């Protein structure tokens, strides 16, 4: 608001000057804020002096009073009172605000005292005027824009007073602030009214100008009251008590309903302006002024208890107000005049009632009807129609334009559950809901056709109808929820459901008209799935880089003895990552390195994430490690790599600083360790290189482009001569970029190999795709079947360059209802088919596949594809990615009338800010991103705030808070929730968790500091019959009997992870259970119950005492087991495991780690289908290794199982570099701290050090010299199969005490560097 240019300039200069100084005390900052507050109000009051009505309305002449202040300071009064304010007051304040001291305190107190006394004099003479304006006098100088700006300024200053709760602040107002908040609301509503009138009036009229003047007068008197009386400057010099201020505001509120103009009541001003607007509606400007605030204005003035009809009117107005907030202008463009007419009629009715009520106390609605000439009951009908229309439009505009076709399945399941749980609430809709349920069941075959026949001749019509059906499913869900929560009146819900039934009937007629069901339904019975279900695995082909690969391979294996970096750089899409991965996974390269690890950086990265990724590859994944500080993780990585020859892949580095962060973790021990680095920038590549010059990837030539396209489309087959010409033309369009070629190859690979189809691809691509990857992605997205579009866009919820675990991704898809069910197939299997199809189209990159069955284990998206997903998902109103840099704030998003179906957050404070404005959101995913700049207290605040605000997302189906957040309580109000993953702080779960009757995936973790005791689950958990995957570490149940009785009720449960069972001798596992992970109880060493689950496929046991008999009995009950993992298991006193014929007949993977096993006897026909055997053992003898080798021989030679893989992790020893004699005790210390070391012995006479143990990549090596380590002696175990090694030491000081060492060191010079090199054995497949 720029009322006075001179004052505005002063304020700006003052702000500039104060902002340049950063070191303000709290007192100084409060003074500065207070001065600005006073300056703004003075600006408002001074400007009002220029209006002609000021003197008539009782406005005080502030300028004259300011002259008196000048005289009191014995300063010649300037020609302008404002100039004095600037020279005397403002300059003094600026001078004393920066570094307040005793003298400045006195100066400020003096200034404050003068101003306060001046205001006292103003208050003594000021009162609300009884007569304001002369009759029929028009004031042409009142501008609506100025009125709104003035009100905004007053509202802004009042907001400051409401927010300050610190008694020491100069802005503090003691006592309750309800009066101020009420005045604020009145001013905001007045502003809405002014905005509405100014937007709708087509030409100046007396009524409008009078109304603007009236609004300005009301706002100006509020400004005067506040400026003269508030704030009270802390607790000092309070000459005005808080109750007096409240009385002043009460007088103001009462004044609003008194006459302010002779012969014309306040309400008459509103009536006249509304009548004037009503007469101009046909010619009104086409502006969207029907904001929720203008509906709030008459609603706010409705009296309670007038009549049933008025109560209904109030209810409808509230609905209109609440839904207008979500409605864009385009959805109302044909209804604006009707909307305006409804609002004006309601306003006339309400204000006429007040006007007549003032003249006649017993005024009735009939009197108002006669006076206004319209019938209220009849006029309520168009209001109802408008309310219903706005509610529908508001809901429709928030629906995404991309849907998962599984939503119809989700609705049908919920309809049955809702009608059972909420039968009383839904009784009046029972018949309509049954009709809807029948209609959706009849449409299920059609939706199945859409998924399984994507290339049907009616593809476009089928997909359009399918999307309409799913939109209707969303509407039904919303209506049912509104009925249960009583958020919408019954008349509206009944009308809405009836319209839905009619619209579904129209959709069915459209389907039948084209015979889409009759033509294709016959094929559905015999076809179990189309090629969309699964596509052959795509290999990452590299064409044209063979010479480069061979050259880089030589540099990796040979070259300098020291560490070296191979940098690959080039523009996006050239294949840097593909080339680097090809080298990183090359067996001839990997076999030469002890450790291989990789990480992907990206433009926005987390240092901790990079360290964790590298540590995961080197020493395995461990959740505890995530809570360690960065410096400890970096030190752990460095010490792990120190004794080994390593190969590291660092992908997508953007800046030199990233390399600076990481290079210290990669020690150079002259053992030919290598690092592969990819980047887009030549400067980064050059900066990281040591001996080898950076490699710049070139673009393909036309011949290479065609070969690459041909390879990606046809694989090992050759292209038909008929397609060669058009294929080469398509390859040329790709601009010689490998990435573009890969994307384009995904389009014709899903089509018939016919010239017409390929010509269509070429025509659709056109010439616009040169150097424009987004255009290619857009075309690839355009040809996707509708059921795959939502799955593809959902990748926008993940961070850039983050490896995505398929198990989590597929469960999210299922929970989001993206997957359409099919009889005879599990949802996971169908979802895998969807994913394989996206991979086959080259839209998703596979980063890891399972060794056993070749299924995708992890994946990721190329940067270009991820960027497309984020932008397109936002455009389709599907998913909004929210991070710290997002300019759009939640309130601006709400008032732009747009909510998204799914939200992905990178930071917890974003989630808190958006929670209040996202009621329609269906999923919230908080991605992994660390915020080290947050204090612990701030984290606790956000944890609590998120927990408190989660119920605002009442339609949530997915809530994934696995990273960062530790919630204080479980949001049991979210009845639609299907996927819930979070960290919790409690040691017990409340029984109210049963209210979450929809979850299929429940994953609860706890921070390390609260894991000292098991998590206590209520017995109601076992009544959550829809659970399919339960992940809760270290849990037990409060009611053993309930567990025994109800555990089998979880018919759909497929995964039960890490239960902490302690004392159950019998346990009935759910019949469909497929994954079971059990950890040992503190109370029992053995498993006290028999594991009986006929469909179990994956079993992991950790920490138990087992024997051959128990495993044999278990095998009899687990005929379908495919994966068995035994960790830290002891085999009784004899340490023996006998495996008989026929045990675990379907077992494919057997993994044994850290077993206490001396003898392993395996029958020849045991494990007939075994594909992979992984052994990492302790306290074992050579018989165990021999048994493993026999299994391999049986599988490969007898069973002809050429894919069988045996991995033996044998005993390893450590490699140490000693620079001088002083490092010997450090070597002892290091060895004793390595968890795999079993014995260290020394022989002083023979001058040798013998080390025996299992030192693998997980060793934690720590330096430090202690007397205990120097003198330590460990007895070598009798086990003979250990891989022992003798290390000769040239030093004759071994075993000497510290004093003797010092004496000898003085008598001789320091010896030359000695190096102890120990080869590490094991780890590679035999």
Swiss-Prot record:
It is a peripheral membrane protein. GO terms for biological process: plant-type hypersensitive response. ATP binds at residues 570-577. Residues 1209-1278 form the HMA domain. InterPro entries: Apaf_helical, Disease_R_plants, HMA_dom, LRR_dom_sf, NB-ARC, P-loop_NTPase, R1A-like_N, RX-like_CC. LRR repeats lie at residues 953-978, 980-996, 1027-1050, 1053-1070, 1071-1094, 1098-1118, 1119-1146, 1167-1191, 1208-1230. GO terms for cellular component: cytoplasm; membrane. Residues 611-864 form the NB-ARC domain. PANTHER family: AAA+ ATPASE DOMAIN-CONTAINING PROTEIN (PTHR23155:SF1152), DISEASE RESISTANCE PROTEIN RP (PTHR23155). Confers resistance to late blight (Phytophthora infestans) races carrying the avirulence gene Avr1. Resistance proteins guard the plant against pathogens that contain an appropriate avirulence protein via an indirect interaction with this avirulence protein. That triggers a defense system including the hypersensitive response, which restricts the pathogen growth. Belongs to the disease resistance NB-LRR family. This protein is encoded by the haplotype B genome of the allohexaploid Solanum demissum. This is Putative late blight resistance protein homolog R1B-19. The lineage of its organism: Eukaryota, Viridiplantae, Streptophyta, Embryophyta, Tracheophyta.
